Amino acid sequence: MKSQEEVEVAGIKLCKAMSLGSVTFTDVAIDFSQDEWEWLNLAQRSLYKKVMLENYRNLVSVGLCISKPDVISLLEQEKDPWVIKGGMNRGLCPDLECVWVTKSLSLNQDIYEEKLPPAIIMERLKSYDLECSTLGKNWKCEDLFERELVNQKTHFRQETITHIDTLIEKRDHSNKSGTVFHLNTLSYIKQIFPMEERIFNFHTDKKSLKTHSVVKKHKQDRGEKKLLKCNDCEKIFSKISTLTLHQRIHTGEKPYECIECGKAFSQSAHLAQHQRIHTGEKPFECTECGKAFSQNAHLVQHQRVHTGEKPYQCKQCNKAFSQLAHLAQHQRVHTGEKPYECIECGKAFSDCSSLAHHRRIHTGKRPYECIDCGKAFRQNASLIRHRRYYHTGEKPFDCIDCGKAFTDHIGLIQHKRTHTGERPYKCNVCGKAFSHGSSLTVHQRIHTGEKPYECNICEKAFSHRGSLTLHQRVHTGEKPYECKECGKAFRQSTHLAHHQRIHTGEKPYECKECSKTFSQNAHLAQHQKIHTGEKPYECKECGKAFSQIAHLVQHQRVHTGEKPYECIECGKAFSDGSYLVQHQRLHSGKRPYECLECGKAFRQRASLICHQRCHTGEKPYECNVCGKAFSHRKSLTLHQRIHTGEKPYECKECSKAFSQVAHLTLHKRIHTGERPYECKECGKAFRQSVHLAHHQRIHTGESSVILSSALPYHQVL
């Protein structure tokens, strides 16, 4: 037995190894071949499962396990790692589970009472003679311990006894049995049991061994059978080789060192696998496509791409997977289980790889660097997507329905749902369904109010990491997505994708009601509300409802007076960002929207569309009260207020109300005295631009008749 001090030292070494991330699952795993598994009884198998799961959970608790091994997924589903082959009876016979060697000893010879050292006990055991009745040969116990008496296909096998660790049990003096040593297959004598003395014939392949001294069989209950125990942590193992590997966790021993990079391993198999990184060796080749792999397990998984085999099916939704680990991870969508928790912030994840990626947020580690531009990423998948998007242009994943290609498999899967309409992720609070799991996660934060992502500059919080990343570009001015056609840059890749459809003319989203097509799905969703009349976003101040949340936000600024968008040229502020963009074209003189009929150019696209109706005569907006039609939606809205009498714009100074915001703006200038329109000839200022235009005719000499006809009688000069 190790001293308490040695145990503590071993524990410190284990903690140190784990803190350095040097322990892998394979370091603490217990491996059985199918043959070995069939030899284990029920108690041993149960113990194996318990130890394996405990080892794995210990690693996960300190974040040292990246992906879940298939064997753990099986054990969590209470399945065996091996299926017992039919027609084979390879397990131990219940009556022959253990073979014990003993000798009738008097009380004064009792080994326990004498407290003899292990060396003396071994000497006494070596003195016992055994005779093989078939071969007619005498055996010393010393020889017996060093030979394999029975081959692997028989009831029991005994191998070399290397040393005796402990004598642990004292028996009553009245017990007839002496001290007994368990000769187990893993070469340790661990326990002392009382046994009834008798002669025992051991039959194996028609061979019989009988002892001249006393040999007995102990009918030990299967559930109490002991395996090898680690003295440091008391974990149980079935093989000496597995125990030896396990003990290297406590000692930190890594005897197998790579001569290329100096990295050391606790197992030779791990070294051999690691060396393929340096040699580039990929000995396992796919016969279908020729792709090679460094590990056979990777080849087996890859081959399912060709066969389409998905042997692991979810019992909840019948979705099938090619890998057991993927099924186990998927099932957590249904259960909501998130067993992997970040020790820094407490955030939990459904798989340990997501936890590993998340922890890099805290550490700032970005181990995957692009060889073309030097940009670094936290995940290898992000690097692969980056290179395909910016450098190689590769889009290896094609949609079989429409032929559209994607840079990654996830993009293809998500795209396919636009064809199938599948929305497998359902909110358990409101029942809303989503095509992407990430969309469900973000949606659920509406119910919880959670905003875990905070800007370190302005402290604004967001419910989605992507929203924070996009927001931070407002501070940095970064626009990493540039159009190759016109050079225009964007903060978001989706904005670039939408913009590129201007050049391609692509409008992939079609309305099923009127067949109108759109370049963006969001525009289609907005359009469909015209048919449904849906206006789900209501103002709490005045009760006005809107079909889009952006319109509600913009409307609420009428009540708050907020104008967060300021022109850097003149300081004028606006309630909407689009208004600022349009206003800035006054300073730049830019008119990017040109009519193909007459060549007239406009600052706003909406103005061009409205103008084109002059050529076409189109009046798509009709009043449902009087039938009058309009070429502009805004004109219809203003007209309808004649019927309703609605005057939603009220002056805060005198409470006078107006049907149009422009009328309110003009009225406010009476109170403020503001006259923003100044004549460059004489300096006279006016509240309205139309008044300035009329005044300027005095200087140009235009007919006063025109002026008088244009103004009400009392305004004629």
UniProtKB/Swiss-Prot annotation:
A zinc finger (C2H2-type) spans 228-250, 256-278, 284-306, 312-334, 340-362, 368-391, 397-419, 425-447, 453-475, 481-503, 509-531, 537-559, 565-587, 593-615, 621-643, 649-671, 677-699. Keywords: DNA-binding, Metal-binding, Nucleus, Repeat, Transcription, Transcription regulation, Zinc, Zinc-finger. Highly expressed in testis. Very low expression in thymus. No expression in other tissues tested. Expressed in a differentiation stage-specific manner in mesenchymal chondrogenic progenitor cells. A motif (Nuclear localization signal) lies at residues 216-219, 385-388. It comes from Homo sapiens. The gene is ZNF470. Residues 23-94 form the KRAB domain. GO terms for cellular component: nuclear body; nucleoplasm; nucleus. One of its GO terms (molecular function) is DNA-binding transcription factor activity, RNA polymerase II-specific. It is found in: Nucleus. GO terms for biological process: regulation of transcription by RNA polymerase II. It comes from the Eukaryota. PROSITE patterns: KRAB, ZINC_FINGER_C2H2_1, ZINC_FINGER_C2H2_2. The keyword Translocase does not apply. May be involved in transcriptional regulation. SUPFAM superfamilies: beta-beta-alpha zinc fingers, KRAB domain (Kruppel-associated box). Gene3D superfamilies: 6.10.140.140, Classic Zinc Finger. Its main location: nucleus. This is Zinc finger protein 470.
